[in-house]
Amino acid sequence: MNKIYTETEGIILPKEISLVPYSNEVDYRTFSAVLDDNKMSATYKMYWLLALLEEIQLHNFDIDFKKLISRMVTFAWYPILKYKLSFGLCDNLVKVVNYIEDTYCLESNCDEKKLLDFIYNCEDKILNKMLKDLTYNVPYRFLSPFFREHTRGERSKVEKIIEELSRTDAECVYEIYIDENKRKRIKIRENWCNYLKNNYRILQGWAYYKLVIFLQKRNLNVPGIAMKLEAPKKRNLTAQTKIWKEIIETNHINDIYTGLEFTKENYNEYGVLSMDHFIPWSFVLHDQIWNLVPTFKNINSKKSDNLLNYDKYIDKFCDLQYKAFSFVVDKKRNNQIEEYRELLRIEDAKKFKEEKTIEEFYKMIKKKVMPVYNIAVNQGFCVVEELG
């Protein structure tokens, strides 16, 4: 039986859920074991299934290994480069992604279709060797639940046994064969084509769910794993920018990264007002006011997804946040007050402002921000000394 895990105060607890969608045309019960995570040491099977589902949506039922592996690399691109997620020591998708980025200087936000086409059509011998190495296990092991009786006790011949059986066993998802150009391919059986196509969304969600569980174990304390599996969606910071404009006008604050005033002349030279995330958005995945820093667009672009030197900027950040906190409390901006209340774990923000000193506010902000900052550093986010 598959399990879904629910979070209770940071502890992940198992809760039984039903099997994959029922069917009287395919062996769905055996299929439900293809992503059995008891001994899983890499993301390959989840990404292989996601690649299969995408190809089927495009009405491709006879697919070469390289196309599916190329899709797997494309799917892993954002989680690895944009969100710095660890895939564990046994997962070689990371090596492929890093090789492509280092060799061809492709951006972390590279268009998915262009990236797929580039990987699939690239003639780089080193890259193609790395892609081929990824095909030695997953196409076969994915089918292993269908052939357990035949492979029990085998170690060195499992892939060969599964390949041969896949050609004659009508129950398994696809057959593995070699085409006239000596390329390995799979041909998805018609009944499985219908099942996978008709249940695309459910099975996609199942694969992502299994992926979240796998990655969560290897990225302890990293927030929002489920939201870090795909390219980030465009966000609208209009409301946050409006509030910060009011805070700037009320408090006459300067840009903490450059020390410059927010004047017309500086806007003309350094770009319009822009909201930066002190700890990168691609790590925290939210736009709450306590992590936002007003700066100039050009400066924000320069900072990008990096962290700044903690010791050099944390006091300036705390001072900025105290002014923002005081503003939203005085102006009764309830949404932003709630964000500070959740961060600082306080019941009454107004009472806190009246009774606590600015030094106590600094201390509480640092207590919350420093652990998140350190986890982001350990996750691989770069630290730069300054932006001036």
What is each of the regions a protein language model found here?
Residues 2-243, 311-328:
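Mixed-charge, low-complexity interaction segments
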Residues 232-238, 252-254, 260, 268-274:
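Active-site-proximal segments of catalytic enzyme domains
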Residues 248-253, 288-292:
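Short metal-coordination and nucleic-acid-contact micro-motifs, chiefly zinc-binding Cys/His arrays
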Residues 259-294, 303-319:
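Histidine-centered nuclease catalytic patch
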Residues 297:
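Long, His/Glu/Asp-enriched segments that create or flank divalent metal/ion-associated functional microenvironments
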Residues 300:
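Active-site loop ensemble at the mouth of alpha/beta enzyme cores that anchors a bound cofactor
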